[in-house]
Amino acid sequence: MKDFLSLASRRQSDRAFDPQRPVEKEKLQRILEAACIAPSACNSQPWHFIVVDDPELKNRVADATSNRVLGMNHFTKQAPVHILVVEERPNLTAGIGSWIKDKNFSHLDIGITAAHLVLAAEDERLGSCIVGWFDETKVRKLLDIPSGKRVLLDIVIGYSTQPDRPKKRKDLKEVISYNRY
């Protein structure tokens, strides 16, 4: 448990990458394997990962991710890899469960697989950042994603040039209770 807590504590959202240093295919493969073994409601695995490492296409995806008006996400241009997470249709059991319980289990599952992915990246000593703010229509068009599919996340990965920073978290007493709220 000590090793896992160390890994989780070390992982941060990195927003500065070495654009000249590519991510090794072997590392990327292990990261994707870790993401694919994440648990999901009724084992539906409602995700598809599109790995963008072609420099020209990556820059076009980064353009769709950054916002000039708000000054957001310009760092995505530096990242050598973008992993787009596309929501797939859940299996019948998970879909019915989502409807009955009024919870989108697919979105929860994608959050879990994203956590696996970024922790695996950290274990490979790679920086990552989960980006949810992007022009989904542009991304869908760039990557030939069918119109009925949702692109939920763009996870950028690369060798971080950002220094480690201390975690700012609420005190455990604020977020944990036992037996009652």
Residue ranges and their predicted role:
Residues 14-30:
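A short N-terminal beta-strand-loop micro-motif at the entrance of redox/enzyme domains
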Residues 27, 43-110:
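Glycine/small-residue-rich phosphate/adenosyl-binding loop
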Residues 69-79, 145-166:
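A glycine-rich helix N-cap at a beta->alpha junction
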